[in-house]
Amino acid sequence: MKSTLSLTLCVISLLLTLFLAALDIVIVVTLYDTIGIKFHDFGNIGWLVTGYALSNAVFMLLWGRLAEILGTKECLMISVIVFEIGSLISALSNSMATLISGRVVAGFGGSGIESLAFVVGTSIVRENHRGIMITALAISYVIAEGVGPFIGGAFNEHLSWRWCFYINLPIGAFAFIILAFCNTSGEPHQKMWLPSKIKKIMNYDYGELLKASFWKNTFEVLVFKLDMVGIILSSAGFTLLMLGLSFGGNNFPWNSGIIICFFTVGPILLLLFCAYDFHFLSLSGLHYDNKRIKPLLTWNIASNCGIFTSSITGFLSCFAYELQSAYLVQLYQLVFKKKPTLASIHLWELSIPAMIATMAIAYLNSKYGIIKPAIVFGVLCGIVGSGLFTLINGELSQSIGYSILPGIAFGSIFQATLLSSQVQITSDDPDFQNKFIEVTAFNSFAKSLGFAFGGNMGAMIFTASLKNQMRSSQLNIPQFTSVETLLAYSTEHYDGPQSSLSKFINTAIHDVFYCALGCYALSFFFGIFTSSKKTTISAKKQQ
């Protein structure tokens, strides 16, 4: 039985690491205008979120496999280090390409933090308490969602946008130290975990690096244990799709050869990934280290209806939430010309309802074990709320009122879909621990992919809508070759939210909101087919 102190330290470390990853996702929302104008590249500004979220998503499954081999604590600490390196690159960048590269590295580390924090958190408590643990982690996530843009806006206005990335360094270091000394398994030998690891590193025979056998073994581990072929195929496929969405209509015409190539080769690579993992590795009968080779994503996990439907519902919810949260801030920055700090306060209109929803769902789940009703309730709130969200016109009371239901929808779905996936794995399964890690990683992968596509799709819809309106307008303003120069002009010549140019920007933002409505409408069809399984509750609670 884990001691109270050990459990408390473990939970604190998980809350800090997850807060760190969530903070980095949303802190850049208020930087769109500043960085887009500074680097003269508003067309690719969506990659501030997408660059992070894409690498966050595609490597989520890899961290799950690494955790099976190296251990969850070790991988969680490594992911924090990688995340810090990415944050430092972003803070020191002097071009959009370098900044996006830093975001990609940070996303790689963040994927380990997000997936493994939930794995550790939900595995150190009983099944009927998982909802409470997910709530604690989700609240940490939601708080970061709320304060992140506010902190980003304050740094952007009073210091520099670079401090939005520097802030991750001390927080990450503090989380790393606590994690290094906390016990995530309850086993006594972990108390001396850090000194033993340092000693092992110091005493390692680095002469092995010069031997062919070392590199042969490394290659075999990468291919057979980590499924590097599957990682390359899936990450390349998703990246090409994202590049097509980002460059289409901005850098290249939609009917250009390179865009067609992106949208052709990308899906082909994803199909090859599915064929390799689901068919070739499963039927080949290959063995490594006396064990059957297991693909990164097994067909048993991906084809499980309960896991698939809940993960897709989570994907669509995160897709919609990214569109709504990012462009709610943009509405107040670009149309009403509020400072980044004041504009970011409006995110609390979504975050507070989401926080309340996660706590309510956790209570109901721990008491009654229900999951599916929370998902269905969430998607219905998402449909109605997203419809109201498209009516926001800048009035404070209206903005607050119309944000309640979308916030509740996100909070309900984010938590309940993870629980719905996890209950598909029974505790008496002989391979329970590994399957539990895989299912949690797959669910987190789907949600991160939703954030990635949401950020990219939002930028694409916004720029395309604005360009189409300007092309058919009769405004007496200079001709602009890019959206970023147009937005810079609107800032320098701002003449109120009712001006023709502000109305064009307002319409483009609302087109993004309509896309969020479509996501929730689609999520309804997956939500109603999620599993009806409940979490196990103790006999004492049932009485």
Curated annotation (Swiss-Prot):
InterPro entries xref list: MFS, MFS_dom, MFS_trans_sf
Domain of life of the source: Eukaryota
GO-annotated cellular components: endoplasmic reticulum; plasma membrane
Gene Ontology biological-process entries: transmembrane transport
Residue intervals on the Extracellular side: 30-41, 101-103, 153-162, 249-255, 322-341, 395-399, 465-508
Cytoplasmic topological intervals: 1-8, 63-79, 125-131, 184-227, 277-300, 363-373, 421-443, 530-543
Xref: Pfam families: MFS_1
UniProt-recorded Gene Ontology molecular function terms: transmembrane transporter activity; xenobiotic transmembrane transporter activity
Keywords from the named record: Membrane, Transmembrane, Transmembrane helix, Transport
Family: Belongs to the major facilitator superfamily.
Function: Drug export permease. Multi-copy suppressor of loss-of-function mutation of GAL11. Involved specifically in transcription of GAL4-dependent genes. Can link GAL4 with the basal transcription machinery if GAL11 is missing. Confers resistance to 10-N-nonyl acridine orange (NAO) and in general to cationic dyes.
Protein name: Protein SGE1
